[in-house]
Regions:
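C-terminal motif of bacterial Sec signal peptides marking the signal peptidase cleavage site
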Residues: 11-15
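Bacterial N-terminal signal peptides that target proteins for export
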Residues: 1-3
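Intrinsically disordered, low-complexity serine/threonine-rich repeat tracts
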Residues: 30, 34-37, 42, 47
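Sequence/structural signature of beta-propeller domains
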Residues: 18-26, 45, 49-383
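Exposed boundary/loop context
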Residues: 5, 28-31
Length: 383
């Protein structure tokens, strides 16, 4: 188990991809509905954070590009889930604030807007986690699977027909935030974080509720913390935890408000990867590709609470020997931590297609989730 130290700033020069079309990088003044940038910078700009680095700082350079924001796509409000087509030709963005999915190509051109269905009695969906279906022979053959804060699981058919509610748990008060696919004992499973109930709900290949052997539970977790996001890497099911508010609907931000666990593929607790420290409502999860030019193989954990990106040297391929060593946070040329207001997803595209698989893409809901952003960070130097 690792209790995180104060934030260091990790090396990793970051360049921003150029885009000249009308949906290209958004000027700072246009990135939020109130005219502010919500902590986001445009191409070539540096993050404006002035927070001093903590001890054991490692110098780094980080800039970022905002590719799409509320100013040039009003549907992109509190952009949350992010998933790429397996062919690597489109990015799907869950617009939590407007109940849509926005689909963009690699040139940042809007190619489709999809309305997320809602249960009876609810006007607009609040989509959160979103994934591409990596097991297309299962889960009704849906191309993408999303979840909502109303407690529904949504399937997006591969033939392009309208999405459908595959499971409706809204009656129980479920609040779904994250979603992942795992194979356990040869069986495909859908894993969904239920922030209200404090559980990871499990579904079989037909979207029917089921169980996983180990239960994906941690009896040592402090009261008031609940599963926030989930992802699978190697032999690990990684679950992040955030502090619940009184309604058990939203997280309570604050430095130290977070935990990360690794479970084996049978749902048994393997190890606590990280506790408290720099964690602040951790949600974004990604592993840097091994062919990337910098921090390859590292586990990246994005804080929704303060927008920082924590970097871990993690071992996740052997269920008996899982671990994570905190290395720092991504930072700018002045050793200030990069901070993306309202940071949600962190994703690398697949090797196939027109997106650069070495570029890190993100979504965010700046300005207290009233704005939205989809952008990129290209890591180009060694730490």
């Amino acid at each position: 188990m690792l209790a995180l130290a104060s934030a260091g700033v990790l090396a990793g020069a970051v360049a921003c991809s150029d885009n000249d079309d009308n949906n290209g990088p958004v000027p700072v003044a246009d990135a939020g509905p109130d005219g502010g940038n919500g902590g986001l910078t445009d191409a070539g700009g540096e993050d404006s954070s002035t927070e001093p680095p903590g001890p054991n700082t490692i110098a780094g350079v980080v800039t970022q590009t905002v590719l799409v924001a509320t100013a040039n796509d009003p549907n992109v409000v509190n952009a949350w889930g992010l998933a790429f087509t397996p062919a690597g030709d489109a990015a799907w963005i869950a617009d939590n604030g407007t109940g849509n999915i926005s689909v963009y190509d690699a040139n940042n051109t809007l190619v489709n807007t999809i309305t997320v269905p809602v249960p009876d009695g609810i006007d607009t969906a609040a989509p959160s986690g979103l994934i591409a279906n990596s097991l297309p022979d299962n889960f009704n053959g849906d191309a993408f699977i999303g979840v909502t804060e109303e407690g529904t699981v949504i399937g997006f058919p591969a033939d392009g027909s309208d999405p459908a509610i595959r499971y409706d748990n809204s009656g129980s008060g479920a609040v779904y935030k994250g979603v992942a696919i795992a194979t356990s004992g040869g069986q495909p499973l859908l894993l969904v974080t239920n922030f209200n109930a404090g559980t990871v709900d499990v579904f079989d290949a037909n979207y029917a509720p089921t169980t996983i052997t180990g239960g994906l539970t941690d009896t040592t977790l402090p009261a008031g913390f609940a599963p926030f996001n989930v992802a699978t890497f190697g032999a690990a099911i990684v679950v992040t935890y955030a502090k619940q508010d009184d309604q058990k609907h939203d997280d309570v931000k604050g430095e130290g408000n977070g935990f990360i666990n690794a479970f084996d593929l049978n749902g048994n607790m393997a190890t606590r990867l990280a506790s408290n420290g720099t964690l602040n409502s951790p949600w974004g999860l990604a592993v840097v590709p091994n062919d990337a030019a910098a921090i390859q193989g590292r586990l990246l954990v994005g804080n929704f609470g303060d927008g920082k990106i924590n970097v871990f040297a993690a071992a996740l391929t052997d269920s008996a020997n899982m671990s994570a060593t905190f290395e720092g946070v991504l930072g700018d040329s002045a050793n200030n931590p990069l901070s993306i207001d309202g940071l949600w997803s962190l994703q690398f595209p697949p090797n196939a297609g027109t997106f650069d698989s070495k570029v890190l893409y993100f979504t965010a809901g700046p300005n207290s989730e009233q704005g939205g952003a989809y952008g990129s960070i290209a890591i180009i130097s060694q730490p």
